């Protein structure tokens, strides 16, 4: 299943401090890693949240980036003030030995394009730069496959589509939610307490017929999907509105709780039906 989620840019509005906002983003990122989310879409819900939007996108991308070239990609910014207290994701694109002698042929690594002594190369996190001429700009992230190993490394650039298993998530900023949903080619799951209760037999069967492309959409704490979309919700095709938290004991479900809960339910029943 190719799983994506959409979250409003106002998702951080209930947190007042940079540290708490950072921790909330981390919780969402970890849930996405655990349940193999391929893309996180941050959409605008009608409010102006420029600072939160920038923070959200920056930290999501930072956490997904392998540690060995985070400084190269992000430099220094106050937005990352509290990321040092966050647990690492340890998703597949971040797992790999730093010992060059242990690198295996055909191993896939994240890399960043660098320039050393006037020549381009790539840093793959092994303490040495591998010579590689790239058409990309310095600082650009790419994915490479190891063609030859220690001591004379060589690499080949590949696309994410060439990786057979889950690798990591990507982050995308987008416009209004209705536009995203109208252009989505696949099943759309709208999470709402006003929706039908989750039915494993019915809803997982829908996911299996989705051609592998599923978008799970979340509202914010103070504005649900129906409030954000209004009457336009009735014009959506190939969508389901589902309540994943029947008989909830709290007045509201926080966004990080909603992401974890909904994805765990989908994952549990999807896995059990394979």
Task: For each feature predicted by the language model, list its residue ranges.
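Post-transcriptional modification and biogenesis factors for structured RNAs
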Residues: 1-274
């Amino acid at each position: 299943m190719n799983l994506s989620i959409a979250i409003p840019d106002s998702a951080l509005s209930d947190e007042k401090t940079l540290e708490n906002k950072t921790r909330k983003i981390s919780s969402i990122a970890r849930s996405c890693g655990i349940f193999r989310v391929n893309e996180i879409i941050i959409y605008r819900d009608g409010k102006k949240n420029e600072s939160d939007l920038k923070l959200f996108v920056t930290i999501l991308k930072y956490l997904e980036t392998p540690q060995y070239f985070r400084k190269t990609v992000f430099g220094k910014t106050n937005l990352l003030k509290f990321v040092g207290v966050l647990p690492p994701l340890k998703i597949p694109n971040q797992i790999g030995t730093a010992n060059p002698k242990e690198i295996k042929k055909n191993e896939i690594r994240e890399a960043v394009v660098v320039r050393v002594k006037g020549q381009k190369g790539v840093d793959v996190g092994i303490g040495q730069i591998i010579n590689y001429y790239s058409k990309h700009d310095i600082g650009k992230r790419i994915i490479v496959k190891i063609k030859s190993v220690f001591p004379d490394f060589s690499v080949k650039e590949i696309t994410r589509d060439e990786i057979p298993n889950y690798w990591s998530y990507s982050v995308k900023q987008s416009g209004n939610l209705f536009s995203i949903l109208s252009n989505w080619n696949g099943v759309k799951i709208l999470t709402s307490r006003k929706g039908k209760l989750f039915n494993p037999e019915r809803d997982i069967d829908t996911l299996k017929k989705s051609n592998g492309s599923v978008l799970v959409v979340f509202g914010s704490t103070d504005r649900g999907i129906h409030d954000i979309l209004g009457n336009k919700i009735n014009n959506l095709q190939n969508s389901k509105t589902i309540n994943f938290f029947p008989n909830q004991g709290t007045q509201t479900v926080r966004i990080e709780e909603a992401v974890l809960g909904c994805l765990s339910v989908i994952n549990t029943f999807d896995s059990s039906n394979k």
